[in-house]
Design a protein with these regions (language model features):
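Membrane-embedded alpha-helical segments in integral membrane proteins
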Residues: 18-34, 81-88, 156-159
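Intramembrane catalytic core of multi-pass membrane enzymes that act on lipidic substrates
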Residues: 63, 67-165, 175-177
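Structural signature of hydrophobic alpha-helical transmembrane segments
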Residues: 37-51, 99, 103
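N-terminal membrane topogenic signal
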Residues: 2-16
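Short, hydrophobic transmembrane alpha-helix segments
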Residues: 24-41, 60-66, 89-92
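Conserved small/polar residues in nucleotide/adenosyl-binding loops
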Residues: 181-183
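Membrane-helix interfacial "entry" motifs
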Residues: 4-8, 34, 38, 42, ...
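Hydrophobic, membrane-facing alpha-helical anchors
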Residues: 19-27, 46-60
Length: 183
């Protein structure tokens, strides 16, 4: 029984490591045209940021055996990574409106979804998905790591567009895509 528990923890930690490695490889593939920020690839920096936010939030979540801020941390990660991408790419300083509009669309979406999920979990007092997960340090860690991957991959199209040296052009395709968000 004792060895089985160790094997499960090692398997969960191996999955978490595999998730990070997979996402890192994905980031390297998609960021071939990314600008550098302070000497390294911006998309790669954002990847690390997404995971570090998750891992830092995991610590108090595991200590207190709570999932109450899991979803809001995901939203915060979307917002933080997009704001960092906009800042590091010079979007605000150079008024790259296409970058700013894409960033704002994701930020508004993250605030909307995050506040809904946060209010839901505080109303319900728990999220049943986590009942068996939050008691296992490795399974809970794997779950937080998966959220880092989820945030990075879901926002990767916007991140690589913002991190492109040319920025995001405002044209008919841009307007069509931006309008789809409001549907």
């Amino acid at each position: 029984m004792w060895m089985g528990g160790i094997v499960k923890h090692l398997a969960n930690l191996a999955i978490a490591a595999g998730v990070f490695i997979f996402t890192k490889l994905y980031a390297e593939i998609i960021s071939f045209n990314s600008i550098d920020f302070e000497g390294s690839n911006l998309v790669g920096q954002i990847l690390v940021m997404a995971f570090v936010i998750q891992w830092i939030a995991y610590i108090p979540a595991f200590v207190f055996k709570t999932e109450k801020f899991y979803d809001i941390t995901g939203s915060f990660t979307y917002i933080g990574t997009i704001l960092f991408a906009l800042y590091a790419s010079g979007s605000f300083q150079n008024l790259k409106l296409g970058n700013i509009f894409i960033g704002l669309a994701i930020i508004i979406w993250a605030i909307r979804l995050g506040s809904f999920l946060f209010m839901r979990i505080h109303k319900d007092k728990k999220d049943g998905r986590f009942d068996s997960i939050k008691t296992s340090f490795s399974q809970f860690f794997m779950t937080w790591t998966l959220q880092g991957m989820w945030v990075f991959i879901c926002s990767s199209a916007a991140l690589i567009a913002i991190a492109n040296p040319s920025g995001v052009p405002i044209n008919s395709v841009f307007i069509l895509g931006l309008s789809l968000i409001h549907i």
